[in-house]
Amino acid sequence: MSLAVLLNKEDKDISDFSKTTAGKSAKKNSRERVADVAPTRVLDKKQAYLSQLNSEFNRIKKRDSIEQLYQDWKFINLQEFELISEWNQQSKDWQFDNTNDSQDLHFKKLYRDMSMINKEWAEYQSFKNANLSDIINEKDADEDEEDDEDELEDGEEDMEEDEASTGRHTNGKSMRGNGIQKSRKKDAAAAAAVGKAIKDDQTHADTVVTVNGDENEDGNNDEDNDNDNENNNDNDNDNDNDNDNDNENENDNDNDNDDEEENGEEDEEEEEIEDLDEEDFAAFEEQDDNDDEDFNPDVEKRRKRSSSSSSSTKLSMNSLSLITSKKINKNITINSDRPKIVRELIKMCNKNKHQKIKKRRFTNCIVTDYNPIDSKLNIKITLKQYHVKRLKKLINDAKREREREEALKNNVGLDGNDLDNDEDGSESHKRRKLNNNTANGADDANKRKFNTRHGLPTYGMKMNAKEARAIQRHYDNTYTTIWKDMARKDSTKMSRLVQQIQSIRSTNFRKTSSLCAREAKKWQSKNFKQIKDFQTRARRGIREMSNFWKKNEREERDLKKKIEKEAMEQAKKEEEEKESKRQAKKLNFLLTQTELYSHFIGRKIKTNELEGNNVSNNDSESQKNIDISALAPNKNDFHAIDFDNENDEQLRLRAAENASNALAETRAKAKQFDDHANAHGEEEEEDELNFQNPTSLGEITIEQPKILACTLKEYQLKGLNWLANLYDQGINGILADEMGLGKTVQSISVLAHLAENHNIWGPFLVVTPASTLHNWVNEISKFLPQFKILPYWGNANDRKVLRKFWDRKNLRYSKNAPFHVMVTSYQMVVTDANYLQKMKWQYMILDEAQAIKSSQSSRWKNLLSFHCRNRLLLTGTPIQNSMQELWALLHFIMPSLFDSHDEFNEWFSKDIESHAEANTKLNQQQLRRLHMILKPFMLRRVKKNVQSELGDKIEIDVLCDLTQRQAKLYQVLKSQISTNYDAIENAATNDSTSNSASNSGSDQNLINAVMQFRKVCNHPDLFERADVDSPFSFTTFGKTTSMLTASVANNNSSVISNSNMNLSSMSSNNISNGKFTDLIYSSRNPIKYSLPRLIYEDLILPNYNNDVDIANKLKNVKFNIFNPSINYELCLFLSKLTGEPSLNEFFRVSNTPLLKRVIERTNGPKNTDSLSFKTITQELLEVTRNAPSEGVMASLLNVKKHAYEREYLNCIQRGYHPNVSAPPVTIEVLGSSHVTNSINNELFDPLISQALSDIPAITQYNMHVKKGIPVEDFPKTGLFPEPLNKNFSSNISTPSMDRFITESAKLRKLDELLVKLKSEGHRVLIYFQMTKMMDLMEEYLTYRQYNHIRLDGSSKLEDRRDLVHDWQTNPEIFVFLLSTRAGGLGINLTAADTVIFYDSDWNPTIDSQAMDRAHRLGQTRQVTVYRLLVRGTIEERMRDRAKQKEQVQQVVMEGKTQEKNIKTIEVGENDSEVTREGSKSISQDGIKEAASALA
């Protein structure tokens, strides 16, 4: 670049630079090569220099062409490989004939090409290995030559010391002045790795490219300028491909900006390049590039350079080799002396350090065309000014050398100086002068001839070795810079272009291969069409034949299977028919066995006659010919009987034998129990009736026992005969009379019969529910006073004492035994089962036997294990939910006959329950056989058949609609429930979930959900009650008398001080004498405000400073029309009109408050004028007017007033409820106690307080009796009505009871119903399922002031007895609240004639028993039953299920299929009633009475 500065005449602003800088830089680069040129060999050295430069460019061109060939070979090889692979992939399905020899013809050419390619690759490898050895030898020679040059340079170091010292001084100032050199040296050190790769390529060259330059420029300028490029190369080596693209884009942008700055210079240089002759390039000699290590694979592996840097360098070198043939260099003639040239060099170095021109002006390269066929790449390269001038110089030097040689050969005779002058003259028009002095000494310089010892041209100036090396180093750096610029800018573009070309070529190859494949397939389809058609037809024929035979085999197999299946079905059907016949015979055998036994027992005890039913002849046709008493008892094993071979007659005989055997076993068991008892008891007389032999009893009629203290009715006496016959036969039974027919007295009468007629006084065991224990004890004591009763209940210690009365030695008790009958509960039986099982009981009675309806319960199992001669079950509802409960009772009394529940279920349960649920057709024959089996063991009479004086009860279902709050709660529950609502309703209708003890977790969750819905139907307050609302009271409350009394006694001054009283003024004497004043207002505000006296006197107190007194005087005196001094005529007229003698009275009244005027008028003096006469009525009214507001007299005289206040004023409710309340702030005026007392006592005015409050009763008594004050003289009190006083005197708001009633549909209807029933004189039983609902009902009854009592499960046994007694004897009690489970069993509540079910039980029989507490013997009035239901809720589903259960009971017990008579009344939102009749007509009077009650 220094040569370009010398040639550039326009650069005249270069600053001075130190001359010693070159010396300092020379020491750092002392190992640079310098050519020793002799003065006598100037032309030879120039020629050598030009030849060396030409060889450099030729070597670069050759390297690029080899690289291009190598890349083309690799690309073609890869494409051929991909083409072959794709072709093979597409030709996999080609089929060839194995016998044809031409099957591999299409592969032979391909194999031949592949072998040729492999051979070429081997030759190329050998060529590369040979070149590698030559490169190594050349490197060794270059190193020897460098050693020689170093020795030459050491000799010249002494000559350069002076210049070096001067350069250091100047350089030091420059560095301290600018502060740039240190940073550039650091950047140069960081770029050493990249510069090393470029210097390696320079060492491979034969000679140095440049001969001019400056050492200082190399050390400072070149290093500084190369830092950016080298740093970018380092970044390219360290970063990924993504970062490479970013760096390339940044470099391209920088280069583009540099190109824009020198567009004008490039245009001029390109015009000069186009004028050059192409003949000038013939002088360059071509040499082989033996040092090409870049294309050797082995050497390339050892080099760890960046791929982007190496590819960019190669591409730039290729581009430069193509452009060297187009550049022309000019011959350089120096006309100035050595100091001027040195100054120009210093200016050149300082110019590069300037900030504005610090950047290099890089070369621009553009690819214009690429021909892949000829492997020709056309590149347009635009060089900057410096590069163009350098090439011009080189080309001109070569041209001059060529002309000089031609002149020498032709003997022109021109010497070297003339030639130089000609050359200088020819090129003088193209050169620019460095300064004004160059033109003056131009001719002298051309005439001088210089000879140098080192062989380098000095161009007419004296140049030492150091300056020559600097110029050489400059051209070396310029050469490196050119390659860096081209590598950085153009390599990426060329790489992208090559990749694009390769992708296009790959696409074309792929398309070509696909086209070849298609063409090959066409050829194949033409040649092999007949073969393919033949194969297709053969395959189709084979497939059709295979399908035909497969179809044929499948049809034969299906036909065979069908025949086998029909045969199996026929055999199965025959087996099923045979099995059904066998099962029918088994069922008939079992039924016949049971019927024979039942028929025999029925004839003995005559159950049909006792029930009042006529027996048809058809019922006993099958039993007339067989007498089981005459047959020999023989037990036939049921499983050993051959039901297939034996006929019906033989099976009947076997069944009769089994029935006879069962009868014999029953008798033997009873005889064994009696014999064992007789062995330990008293011996009986021989002539006494032997009751142990029932066959000798015959038909006898038992009379009522004499020890029974009552008279049995006819049907009860028949029941006694039936029970006695059962005992005689040793058979257990079920007394299932309808509730209220006296099952208790019948069971007591049979005990009296055994004691009186058979001298069996026990031990007898009676097990009852806990609620009927006292009733049984009372009944036995009442009807059998001679019996000793042992009530067995209480705690563990009490029961332990009671067990001492047991006599375990004697199995039969006498009259003098410790006890005769022990009464206990089911709970005690389970608790003390171990003790009770040790006793042998003569007779065990189970009251309310539905308690053992479950065969899985501990009650059933424990009671079944007791040792008893006979068992008697008392129940009004033997079937509550299903037929399984009936089987449990039957198995309990006859385990030998009813031993299998599955058989019983097969006989009756399925048919009857399905009939009740699905209303299917009932098998009447099967129902008749069931009744025949049950009759000997169960006696049931209905009230209407045996008790004519007891009328039918009227049942009415009252349907209500949900209120708004209930409907919202119901919908919220339905939306929040996780289970389907239909499943919940089904669970509500499932009876097993409510009674079974072993419910699953899911069923229990369903039941809980059902209970939530039932709570909504009953009352929404079951979820959340409305609380009492009270504001925060910012108040100091007054202390009551009791608190003050305790405070005085304890000398607690804090309480008294809070009450604004002095302890000294109080004494126990005053407290005990009651000298306290009753105050209706005692609360005070905790805040006390002290009003300044100045403000009071100036603003409030009337004075001359304000108009307070004037305004009051004007308003009350001057503007008052009743002032006599102003309006005398009006006052006189009013005085005459009213008879008031004083004219000032009107003025006084007008200034008196209204309340005080009313009080004064009522308390005014009586008129004692003798002329006024009053009647007795008027005097009584006068007394009435002044009567006190409390007491009996006030209540009697003010009935109308109290009714008005209760009905109307009570409805007034507070509309606003404040959150905070406080009395007025206490105001005190400092220094004025009068004002403070008047303000504080404003609410305690005696006249107002007395008028608003009531005089206590004790005070009235003392005033009238002790002090003798007449009643008419009492002050008027109670002017403020009590309801308003209750509602407005306090901010505490309680929940409204009216709203409490109206928010529940059931309670609202019940409220209307109770009003009617109360007015008509009825007494009501109300049954509940929830005790919490009973609590709410008690609040309602207290609000309505209905007299009521309550009995639930928490009531004690002694309390239950007293409650029942009070209900039966006290007619003032209007309502009896009972829980269905606790109050629905075993108690007599005939004092009530109305039963209301607020919510129904799961089991309809529980409700039936609860109804019969009132509808039983002793009831003389019509009984009406109301059932409250909510329409469209879960209660309707429960009611439907209850009706199905009731139908099952009717079918089994009565044989009826008609629905029960129930009247339904639907109450809508507007309280309109719609009556729906039942299936059977009932008493019209009862319906009218019930309807009138609901009206």
Swiss-Prot record:
Modified residues (Phosphoserine): 65, 115, 133, 616
Motif (DEAQ box): 847-850
Biased composition, class Basic and acidic residues, residue ranges: 399-408
Predominant subcellular localization, coarse grouping: nucleus
Gene3D superfamilies: P-loop containing nucleotide triphosphate hydrolases, Tandem AAA-ATPase domain
Localization in the cell: Nucleus
Sequence ranges of Acidic residues compositional bias: 140-164, 214-297
Composition bias, Low complexity: 307-317
Catalytic activity: ATP + H2O = ADP + phosphate + H(+)
PROSITE patterns tied to this protein: DBINO (PS51413), HELICASE_ATP_BIND_1 (PS51192), HELICASE_CTER (PS51194)
A Pfam family this chain is assigned to: DBINO
GO biological process, one term: regulation of macromolecule metabolic process
Superkingdom, taxonomy of origin: Eukaryota
Keyword Repeat: no
Segments forming a coiled coil: none
Quaternary structure note: Component of the chromatin-remodeling INO80 complex, at least composed of ARP4, ARP5, ARP8, RVB1, RVB2, TAF14, NHP10, IES1, IES3, IES4, IES6, ACT1, IES2, IES5 and INO80.
Record's comment describing the protein's domains: The DBINO region is involved in binding to DNA.
Protein name in the entry: Chromatin-remodeling ATPase INO80
Top-level taxonomy: Eukaryota, Fungi, Dikarya, Ascomycota, Saccharomycotina
